[in-house]
Curated annotation (Swiss-Prot):
GO cellular component, one term: cytoplasm
Organism: Pseudomonas syringae pv. syringae (strain B728a)
UniProt subcellular location: Cytoplasm
Any one Gene Ontology molecular-function term assigned to this protein's record: thiosulfate-cyanide sulfurtransferase activity
Record-given protein name: Thiosulfate sulfurtransferase GlpE
Example GO biological process: glycerol metabolic process
Coiled-coil stretches noted in the UniProt entry, renumbered to this chain: none
SMART domains per UniProt: RHOD
Record-annotated active site: 64 (cysteine persulfide intermediate)
Domain Rhodanese: 16-104
Amino acid sequence: MTEFKRIPPEQAQALREQGAVLVDVRDPQAFESNHIPDSVHLDNHSIADFIREADLDKPLVVVCYHGNSSQSAAAYLVGQGFSDVYSVDGGFELWRTTYPQETVQG
């Protein structure tokens, strides 16, 4: 079984530019307040539909607050059949510091 990889925001941005799917596992209020453009909010209510509709071979980058919860989510997604999964070290907080222009509200 493939395992997920931990990556810094810079590598996540490179994957994003190459068409990877970004999923944000923070709570809905945090996502609404600020998130990475084109990222998908993923929670217990949306995960089944997301998995059913996803391309399991497309790179998938998981982001949370600080890079901890995203590791559990990434491991779960690997277990669901995704073959190319990444967890962003430092999470959205480090992303926002590294790429302040690459965040949106709403």
